[in-house]
């Protein structure tokens, strides 16, 4: 028997209501009532939090955090996220985004971000961001490289290639 289900999701989360307020990298631009849907379908308790927050808790309990009461965890993937555990408590902050560093503006004239802003950290440092930067820089690059050739040939390029 299951006691309940816990889930981490990208984007802004209302942990009280169990809704995803906006997960732009998943193209969720409207409120998603995840808790209501899961609980009504399965009949067991459901808890929801931001994926970087959940990862920070996991890293604190079972990972490099070694159960330290103070842990900061940064996630790099489609976006850039972060979770902060201070004095043993997960910090949520406004809209559950205490550690969400991906949407800090690092270049006001930078690339457009999925959140609607311009020049966010994740536009250049996430898995998709480093590919975007490589494609942008390859336009001016006059040297010889396998990456430049792949981009020029229209091949799919991933962050692993970069």
Model-derived regions, located:
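Glycine-rich phosphate-binding loop and adjoining helix at the ATP-binding site
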Residues: 3-5, 12-72
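Short glycine-rich anion-binding loops that position phosphate/pyrophosphate groups of nucleotides
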Residues: 10-13, 77-79
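Active-site/binding-pocket entry motifs
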Residues: 11-13, 110, 136
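Glycine-rich phosphate-binding loop of actin/hexokinase-like ATP-binding domains
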Residues: 67-124
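A mobile "lid/hinge" subdomain adjacent to the ATP/sugar-phosphate binding pocket shared
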Residues: 121-162
